[in-house]
């Protein structure tokens, strides 16, 4: 059983055995190519990141002292520094995190450390924005690589959502529609949501957020505009709230009127934004059937950002934290196929060698933008702080931050 890395790896890359995988299970390590990262990072040339030049000079990735340099910088900064690491980060980066977790946990951890002057967020852009919103003005949030964005978050721009709201207004349904935005969205979208009476949600509390939205004001014909991930919205509505698939319609911001008729907008309960996760959206029902045929007794565990047919075919569905807890509690000798980002799957396999843990898809799939945060960028960020410089600071405009904070606070107050 070979996990091929042909889409990401140069010809001749060697497969590597990972502890915790069943005998004979190998995969070829993906190698990030400048072209792939350029496209995902939205830069205009290979020397820029997200269209913004990277100031300073990065340490060479081949420097054998990178880890020691990171440790030394952390020691010098002491309590002034707090490093956050998302579960999807590389091993070389996650080892330096003071706290690991999903996006919302990390944002809350940042807010709980008012003594930390510098918060280095090893994640992606929207996560650093949320940390900036939830922390004090005296704290500075830094993102080691500005090209570490999120394709899903980028699928819903503020202008697109404003235009969508105009469509709902023209259809006569805006006054009974509550926006619910996934944590994986920009600060501008969270701000829109807060200003229009809505809330933020995570993959672990999406059910509570949707129930709150549909019950808001006691109106029996409430609607939800769920963005930017259609799959999480659909899976939660159908599996947790008991709605039918025909109660959900997809609003496509690239089509006039969202590609929907006025009747469709009025009849639907869930207006799902046409967005998805580039990693979780890759998994298919065929992947589930294939792994069941190859691994006897395998239990399939997937993230709710997966397509509805994948979630329906799986045995267990839950957030990143749920996936981790499920594997930790699993019986020794049990077999698992996990449908989420590869860095986390590999880390779980390594941490639980008494269980057979495999990636749901044969082709390896990292979150390429998350994977941009590497050790050279982390060392550059930390050493810049030691030298008295602040690089790649993430700040959210005060009005946007205030409205986004309203939406985040509504989530925290959910019953």
Can you annotate each of these PLM segments?
Residues 16-20, 24-339, 344-415:
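Active-site loop-to-helix "anion-binding N-cap" substructures in soluble metabolic enzymes
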């Amino acid at each position: 059983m070979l996990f091929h890395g042909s889409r990401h790896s140069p010809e001749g890359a060697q497969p590597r055995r990972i502890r915790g995988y069943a005998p004979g299970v190998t995969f070829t390590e993906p190698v990030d190519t400048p072209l792939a990262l350029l496209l995902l990072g939205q830069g205009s040339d290979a020397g820029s990141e997200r269209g913004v030049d990277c100031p300073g000079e990065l340490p060479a990735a081949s420097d054998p002292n990178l880890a020691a340099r990171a440790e030394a910088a952390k020691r010098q900064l002491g309590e002034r520094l707090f490093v956050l690491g998302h579960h999807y980060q590389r091993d070389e980066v996650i080892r330096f995190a003071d706290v690991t977790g999903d996006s919302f946990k990390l944002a809350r951890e940042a807010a709980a450390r008012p003594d930390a002057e510098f918060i280095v967020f090893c994640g992606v852009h929207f996560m650093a924005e949320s940390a900036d919103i939830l922390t004090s003005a005296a704290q500075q949030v830094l993102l080691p690589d500005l090209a570490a964005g999120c394709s899903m978050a980028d699928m819903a721009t503020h202008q697109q959502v404003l235009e969508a709201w105009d469509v709902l207004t023209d259809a006569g349904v805006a006054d009974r529609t509550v926006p619910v935005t996934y944590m994986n969205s920009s600060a501008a979208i969270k701000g829109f949501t807060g200003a229009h009476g809505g809330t933020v949600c995570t993959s672990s509390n999406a059910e509570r957020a949707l129930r709150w939205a549909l019950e808001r004001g006691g109106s029996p014909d409430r609607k939800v505009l769920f963005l930017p991930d259609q799959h999480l919205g659909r899976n939660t509505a159908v599996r947790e709230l008991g709605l039918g698939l025909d109660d959900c319609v997809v609003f496509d911001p690239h089509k006039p009127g969202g590609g929907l008729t006025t009747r469709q907008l009025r009849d639907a309960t869930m207006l799902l934004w046409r967005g998805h996760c580039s990693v979780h959206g890759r998994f298919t029902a065929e992947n589930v059937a294939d792994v069941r045929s190859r691994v006897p007794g395998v239990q399939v565990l997937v993230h709710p950002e997966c397509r509805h047919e994948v979630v329906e075919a799986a045995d267990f569905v839950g957030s990143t934290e749920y996936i981790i807890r499920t594997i930790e509690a699993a019986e020794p000798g049990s077999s698992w196929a996990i449908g989420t980002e590869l860095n986390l799957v590999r880390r779980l396999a390594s941490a639980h060698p008494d269980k057979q843990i495999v990636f749901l898809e044969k082709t390896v799939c990292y979150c390429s933008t998350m994977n941009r945060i590497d050790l050279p960028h982390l060392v550059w960020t930390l050493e810049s702080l030691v030298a008295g410089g602040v690089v790649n600071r993430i700040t959210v405009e005060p009005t946007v931050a205030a409205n986004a904070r309203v939406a985040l606070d509504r989530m925290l107050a959910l019953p």
